[in-house]
């Protein structure tokens, strides 16, 4: 999950090579919204300057074009979710995506952890406790700032063996299909209840966990599988799979420009955090590898000298997790966005972060990665106007102008109303 050290940079499909840390990039952070509860992401509908904020506890809030945070939520689904733990929880309202034709059809999609029927309390919190659900809703015909919460159409439902490693970022690609990140099912080491004991869920192609999924929500009931998905027609393979070998893909995003690549940060076990560029049919290694290193699920801190990683793609970025070394960046990587805003020198840079260097205090980190040919170099981001930026970095957001935002919290769990969203601007 987290880390600080030198950086691994890699060509896609090749072994990563290490480089020394680059100098920090100076930025300023401007508060655009506050009084929030664990904001995880912020997205805008196509052609709309409003920004929609996902709060983990089950609400979507609107930040208007002129910067006003509306009191009344756009959507509140708390009664559909399992109750959340207040000190720390990976469940909740996790994702939001607007249909490419939102202006015409008013459709949008959310990802959340629903109650499993018959399990209404926290007494079964650790095993088969919730269903990761992606649902379609529509905006109210009478009020553009309110959703019609009564017309839920469930798209995908995946029962989850543990409370953690949910993933469930959702987003539409440039091809118009909906992509869904799915974690390995939780617990640790891709092992235990709900995991394939022989190879883990990440490498089990008959299983939905540990994958990137790709579906067509415009056809079928409740969806269709695109014919060009890489594993369509393969025996004993889930046809919705677009890519495999992921552990806990915590925040993905499509580049608004360039070649519209899909970036996913993947939280490591104990030692290494990584960022991948997701491609059709790609296998990103878990649990055969953690980052660029051969992984032993029985001895997770002792990496193997070799492994059968044929056909696997190494990350473009890797850094050390603070669980096992002080030469590290943090504990849990948080994926971000490629910058496409007004600052010319930042074009094409990937902004991301880490939740914190420690559980003991708020010590989130911000990073930026720059491509040079086939390799990427990572550097720290220095916040010059807030020298003591003490917050947990929960997520990032992006508006239709390409600006990137930071979701920052002062608590480890979804409680209170003290959290802020910052816009990253030039110093």
PLM regions: where:
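Blade-edge beta-strand/turn elements of extracellular beta-propeller
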Residues: 25-34, 68-87, 136-161, 191, ...
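Extended hydrophobic/aromatic segments used for targeting, binding, or gating
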Residues: 62-64, 224, 273-277, 283-301, ...
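Extracellular protease catalytic domains of secreted zymogens
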Residues: 264-269, 277-339, 343, 347, ...
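Acidic, Gly/Ser/Thr-rich repeat motifs that build Ca2+-stabilized beta-propeller blades
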Residues: 23-187, 251-254, 260-271, 329-373, ...
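Bacterial N-terminal signal peptides
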Residues: 8-17
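Bacterial N-terminal signal peptides that target proteins for export
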Residues: 1-8
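Acidic, glycine-rich loop-and-beta core segments that form the ion-binding/anion-interacting portion
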Residues: 230, 236-280
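Predominantly five- to eight-bladed beta-propeller fold
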Residues: 128-134, 192-214, 218-220, 276-298, ...
